[in-house]
């Protein structure tokens, strides 16, 4: 099979990259676990130092956990604790996890929240700048969404009670929608104006996925807190948050923690090797180049098939949105194409609130020939279903 899912954006270095495997094996022979409250393993220290090299200079403190949801919860706890404010602003269509607080912040599908009410409070939802959904260009969408945010701060959550705004720079489960760069810049300015922390959830878009090590870099901004997971460990369970010293120092010993976060030396060694592979093998640059090649091919197919309403993305985080003739979301078409690709040994996933978007998430090691093969299979899948 040709895996263009990467385990939902996890195996960025490919399956069983030799350097990652070797790091895991070597670490297992020396130390498996060291609780960070007692002893910090050399692997964990080296991982923090490696991440320090790829984060903004203002970001110099790291906390490790096991899953994306844990890291999101940690970012919210830190924001609330540091600011002494309670509310968190999230965006429509977001996915931040399945634990209680993260689930309360997730709005991409009702299934993630169904029958789990009541959920933790202090969460306010703002419109995400989804230009295709609105039928506008990015400038119009940005202006509208920023006006709505301003209204929200006047009507639902005053700045002095808003701890943070959290955003996925590329909406993940909500449809693989990149936030316009001008929106990210305006959002940073809004947070600065009101002393609100900006959290970027890079769980799916980070670690080279979009052609930058972190997706927020495309906008030339610096967040206050970065959330990372998935591609960080090449399949091992690790996540983390990164922030500034003055924010992290609000966490006194015992304020937050966990047994396994940063404690598993094997996981830390694998994550360190993953970061090294991404950098040494120039996978960030490859993601940018192959992503451009992929989108060019998909746009050619869009010209031939009217069921493809939109092709969008950054790097190797690309979404193809399917619509019916009247422009409404069409999940049936997306599922049929996905199944036809599976029958041809190519793995793809759907996403979006209407489940009408096929997402392309190949490993960052993918080459031009494999992209071409994937596009060929995708074209066959469209033709099999007589999609014009």
Kindly give the residue locations of the regions a language model identified.
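Conserved N-terminal phosphate-binding loop of PLP-dependent enzymes in the Aspartate aminotransferase
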Residues: 1-388
């Amino acid at each position: 099979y040709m895996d263009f899912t990467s385990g939902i954006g996890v195996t960025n270095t490919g399956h069983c990259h030799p350097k990652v495997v070797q790091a895991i094996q070597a670490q297992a022979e020396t130390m498996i676990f060291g609780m960070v409250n007692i002893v910090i393993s050399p692997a964990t220290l080296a991982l923090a130092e490696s991440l320090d090299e790829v984060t903004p200079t203002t970001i110099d403190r790291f906390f490790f956990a096991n899953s994306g949801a844990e890291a999101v919860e940690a970012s919210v706890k830190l924001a609330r604790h540091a600011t002494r404010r309670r509310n968190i602003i999230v965006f429509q269509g977001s996915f931040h996890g399945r634990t209680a607080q993260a689930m309360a912040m997730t709005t991409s599908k009702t299934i993630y929240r169904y029958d789990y009410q009541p959920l933790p409070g202090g969460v306010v939802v703002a419109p995400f700048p989804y230009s295709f959904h609105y039928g506008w260009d990015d400038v119009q969408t940005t202006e509208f969404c920023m006006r709505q945010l301003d209204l929200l701060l006047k009507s639902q959550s005053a700045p002095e009670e808003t701890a943070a705004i959290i955003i996925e720079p590329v909406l993940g489960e909500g449809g693989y929608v990149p936030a316009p760069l001008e929106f990210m810049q305006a959002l940073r300015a809004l947070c600065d104006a009101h002393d609100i922390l900006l959290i970027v959830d890079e769980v799916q878009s980070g670690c080279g996925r979009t052609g930058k090590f972190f997706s927020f870099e495309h906008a030339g901004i610096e967040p206050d807190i970065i959330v990372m997971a998935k591609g960080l460990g090449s399949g091992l369970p690790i996540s983390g948050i990164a922030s500034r010293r003055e924010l992290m120092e609000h966490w006194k010993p015992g304020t937050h923690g966990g047994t396994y976060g940063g404690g598993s030396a094997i996981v830390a060694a694998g994550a360190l090797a993953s970061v090294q592979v991404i950098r040494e093998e120039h996978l960030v640059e490859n993601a940018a180049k192959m992503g451009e090649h992929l989108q060019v091919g998909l746009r050619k197919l869009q010209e031939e098939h009217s069921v493809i309403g939109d092709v969008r993305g950054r790097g190797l985080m690309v979404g193809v949105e399917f619509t019916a003739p009247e422009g409404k979301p069409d999940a049936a078409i997306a599922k049929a194409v996905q199944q036809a690709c599976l029958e041809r040994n190519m793995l793809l996933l759907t996403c979006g609130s209407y489940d009408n978007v096929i997402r392309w998430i190949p490993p960052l090691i993918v080459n031009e020939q494999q992209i071409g093969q994937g596009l060929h299979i995708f074209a066959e899948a469209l033709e099999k279903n007589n999609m014009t």
